[in-house]
Regions:
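SAM cofactor-binding core of SAM-dependent methyltransferases
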Residues: 9-57, 68
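Class I S-adenosyl-L-methionine
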Residues: 48-66, 73-226
Length: 226
């Protein structure tokens, strides 16, 4: 509408990976998205900064209208064998502390087994968005967001859980990590709702953009109502 102020023009996407979360916010209507990751992300579809996410948000976070963070989940992921999880960083508390210092809405995303470290998270599932995957993920926020009930019966999973895999080098999981069973990468991208060139590893570490599109629309509606 002409003359309407844009209330969520800029979003900071921390630990951005290849952009699954960022793309969802873009589809929700966020004008500008800046992704930050310690590793190069050549297929990230928006402005990208290679940097330490927590150092970047401490210096620049106040210049954004909202912040999304997906701290590394290897300390909790069932795709990583238990004996290898020891010593993996749990950055959820440190990420929350950094975001709590800022007066902006934020969302923290992680895997279900990280739930004990998250504050009143809601769960999203691919089946709730008509996707043939489950990819359950938890979302914590300092503003109110709603979860959606799964629709496992209506949209059954076509892929086995990641922890049932036998060959980590040649196969892709749509539950997170690698899994037994090969399919065409275009099929995996379609199942995730990804329409840009993510590779196998990036897909395995991403979330479906539908999750943050849903959350982003809710954030925008909330901010417009203030």
């Amino acid at each position: 509408m002409a003359g309407t102020e844009i209330v969520m023009a800029r979003l900071l996407d921390l630990f951005c990976g290849a952009g699954g979360a960022g793309m969802g916010y873009h589809r929700a209507g966020v004008d500008e998205i800046v992704g930050v990751d310690i590793n190069p992300q050549p297929r990230y579809p928006f402005e990208f900064v290679q940097a330490d996410a927590l150092e970047y948000v401490a210096e620049h976070g106040g210049g954004f209208d909202a912040i999304h963070a997906s701290p590394p989940c290897q300390a909790f992921s069932q795709a990583v064998k238990k004996r290898y999880r020891k010593g993996r960083p749990n950055l959820i508390p440190e990420t929350r502390m950094a975001l709590d210092r800022l007066d902006v809405p934020y969302v923290i995303e992680n895997v279900p087994t990280a739930g004990v470290h998250m504050r009143e998270p809601v769960t999203l599932c691919g089946s709730a968005f008509g996707l043939p995957i489950r990819r359950h993920r938890l979302f914590e926020s300092n503003v109110w967001i709603w979860g959606i009930l799964c629709s496992h019966k209506e949209y059954p999973r076509r892929y086995m859980p990641a922890w049932n895999r036998t060959n980590l080098l040649r196969v892709l999981s749509l539950s997170g990590g690698y899994q037994q069973g090969k399919t065409d990468i275009e099929e995996h991208r379609a199942a995730m709702g990804v329409d840009w060139d993510m590779d196998i590893k990036e897909l395995s570490q991403s979330i479906p953009p539908a999750y943050t599109e849903y959350i982003g629309k809710g954030l925008i509606a909330l901010l417009e109502g203030e």
